[in-house]
Every structure is written in C-alpha cells, then in structure tokens.
Amino acid sequence: MHEKLTTRFAPSPTGYLHIGGLRTALYNYLYARKNGGNFLLRIEDTDLKRNSKEATKAIIEAFKWCGLEHDGEVTYQSERFDLYKEYVKKLLDEGKAYYCYMSKEELEELRAKQEAAKERPRYDGRYREFTGTPPQGIEPVVRIKAPQSGEIVFEDGVKGEVRFKAEDIMDDFIIARSDGTPTYNFTVVIDDALMGVSDVIRGDDHLSNTPKQIVLYEALGFKIPKFFHVAMIHGEDGKKLSKRHGATDVMEYKEMGILPQALLNFLVRLGWSHGDDEVFSLEDLKKLFDPYHINKSASCYNAKKLEWLNAHYIKTLPFEEINRQLKDLGFDLSVYEKAGFLLDLLRERAKTLHDIINGAKSIVNAPQNYDENAVQKFVNKNNLELLQAFANTLKDQKTGKDFEDFTNDFLEKKEAKLKDLAQPIRIALTGSAVSPSIFEVLEFLGVDECKKRIDNFLKVRGK
C-alpha cells in the first residue's frame, strides 16, 4: 500500500514565529497539499522552563492569519513524556542504549584533557559495556550506542547525497537526561515516526542533527523519512537575517499592513522559483511547488520586493478580502458610503494597508489642519481667488468625468492651467498635497461637501 505523503512543522514555543519558520511551514504545507497528503503541526514544548504560552498562541494565530490549515489536532510534546519513556526503556531492554554514570566533574575533566590534546570534545564511552555496581549518588543519563566507524549517508532532496563519517561527528549521545526528560533528537524521531511523517523539510541548521536522528531511526526500527534541508534567509548584507534587517516576527508584518498573500508569495520565492514568474496565489502554489527545485544557496531578503508584492495584492484582491484584513487592524471600510469606490481610489497608490487607512481618513474626514509645507509651496493669493471662483461655479457635477470636463472648461475661461488649481483643491479637500486623482476625490465627496471644505479652507487661509 502506498503511504500518504505527510509533512509537519514543529516549532519550539520559546519565541514568536520567525519568517524563516513561516517559510519552512509554507514549504511543508504546499508539498503536502500538492500531493493530497497531510500537513501536521507539532509544538515542541519539552523545555518547560523556556516555553511560553503566548508564543504557542502566536504561532497558531500566525497560521490562521496566513491561511495555513494543518490536518488534525495540534500535537504537544509536553503531553507525550510517558510515550518517550517507553521507547527509552525499549532501547535499554534491547541493549541499544545504556545508563551512563559519569559525574559533571568527570565530564569536565575529560573535556579539558581532550582540549589540551587538541581533540574534538566527545564522550569516551566508558560506560558503554559497564556491568558493575553503579556509583552512589549519581542520577544517570541514558546514551544510545552509536556507530563508532563507517559512514552515515542519506540523499537530501535539496543538497543531494550527504555523507558523515561516524568517527568525526558521533559519540554515544544522550537520549534521556538525568531527570528522565528526553532530548530533542530523540523526541523528534519518535514523533515523526509515530505521526507517519514521510518528508521533512527544514532549515539546514538542522543538518548536523540528521545523522544522529538516522542512528535513532535505525535503532528503533523506524522508516527514515526523506529530508530536505533548506538554506537560511540572509539579509541584504549577506548575513543571517536578524532584527537589524527589519521585522522578523510574522505578526509584526500584519501590524505593518502587509497582506498574508503578499508575505507568503514573498517567502516562497526566497529559495524556490517557477520560471520567471513572481506572483503566485496560494492555490497556484499548491499545484506548482516542488521541494526538489529549492535552491541550494541562501536567499536574500529584499524589502522592496515585499513592498512591491504587497502593492500588487492591494490593487488586485477583492474588496471583501482587503476589508477583512483592514478589520484585523481595527478599521472597517464598509461603514462608509461608496466604500468600494473609496478603496478603488486609494489602492492604486497604496503600498501597505496603513496607506489605505490613512488615505480613507484623509478623504472621508474634513481636514482639521492643513500641511503647512504644502500650503507654503502651492497656495498664493492668485490661486486662492481661482479656488474661490471654482467653488462658486460648481453646480451639479456627479462623476469624475463630469468634474474633469468642468475643470478644463473653467480653466480655459480663466486662462489658467491645471497646475494652478489642482494642488490648492487637493489641500482644501484633504489637508495634504498628496491624494488620489483629484477628479475622483471630487466625485467621491460630491459638490456640496467639496464646496463646504473649500469654503472652510478659504476662511482659514484667506485671513
């Protein structure tokens, strides 16, 4: 029987979800969806001292915001300690693992000798075949009997064949600490095997864990999954992405007014491509994504590309979706009359959702203040008189075309040019010299509101 392709994302809730983690989750999600498989979410919360409930909540919220739906319930490792203990006991009973009674002082002494001899620090296996009486007062750790020679070889979906010499990297590593808690590599193997994970896509910072995990898969008699190790995301300076390159927490992007569609599109392209295409919907990606086409080299974070993609999605997504995202930021466009027209007014220039919010407020609400720099630059006695005449002549215009035709006729009669009038109108209506097409703003506000705002501006500035 052909097994169902199953991937997983397994973050540790010791901090908020980083965009590198979201990219890993996205790759796993897309590969599962393309193949009709399962995408699982596992929270690796065995570090009870460092775990944060807020971080766990933020991870799940980020998934919801991005529309990455996992299959089944979330698995929490902290609820599976009894299961891990069963498998530690199994390996002990089969002679594949053993208790090690080395004290902390003995370990430090061994490490100091190895460093003095310029040897790689490693456990020397002194309790590997121990059958004597255990020393008093020592709570033992449990170590796996790892191979001491030969090679560990696997075919990585991104990097190709990867080889590790056992003697160079391996010692009898710990699978259970002295307090009985299992170690990271041990829990990962147990869970991936029992959850039916067939394919593991993860950052290449996990590459060094892979030979240890393969040793455990073989010792436990589990099938080894297919591994794909993805190069890290770098900043534009070529260094590992960090806070100094900008936001790294996924939910910070939401607060910045970035759409999830734009962020996912941006992240998938950091390491994967499909021809020269730049824009992909999530539905497109479910059909096209192939982890075997992930680049081997690190990808470079490009803030301008994210901004460009965000502007694209603001221009093209339907009103309902844009407004749903705006509501998450505490702003509901639908409460305004002609809300769809207002969005269309604003979306052509907008780079973030905050541009929509600020633009809507500046148009819908009559200005309380006027940009002084804009006034000094664009307003003078002559065009104040022109503006007054313009307002007095407005009558029954309704569409942007009506306002444009009327304005052109008005300027021709006054022997003036659009540049003499456009910015004063813009400032009078919105308080700023920056706005969408002035004729569309006139249409949105209507003749009565336009006259009212121009009159108010003239009262304030005409003193």
UniProtKB/Swiss-Prot annotation:
One of its GO terms (biological process) is glutamyl-tRNA aminoacylation. GO terms for molecular function: ATP binding; glutamate-tRNA ligase activity; tRNA binding; zinc ion binding. InterPro entries: aa-tRNA-synth_I_cd-bd (IPR045462), aa-tRNA-synth_I_codon-bd_sub2 (IPR020751), aa-tRNA-synth_I_CS (IPR001412), aa_tRNA-synth_I_cd-bd_sf (IPR008925), Glu-tRNA-ligase_bac/mito (IPR004527), Glu/Gln-tRNA-synth (IPR000924), Glu/Gln-tRNA-synth_Ib_cat-dom (IPR020058), GluQ/Sye (IPR049940). GO terms for cellular component: cytosol. A motif ('KMSKS' region) lies at residues 240-244. ATP binds at residue 243. It is found in: Cytoplasm. A motif ('HIGH' region) lies at residues 11-21. It catalyses: tRNA(Glu) + L-glutamate + ATP = L-glutamyl-tRNA(Glu) + AMP + diphosphate. Its EC number is 6.1.1.17. Monomer. NCBIfam families: gltX_bact (TIGR00464). Belongs to the class-I aminoacyl-tRNA synthetase family. Glutamate--tRNA ligase type 1 subfamily. This is Glutamate--tRNA ligase 2. It comes from Campylobacter jejuni subsp. jejuni serotype O:2 (strain ATCC 700819 / NCTC 11168).
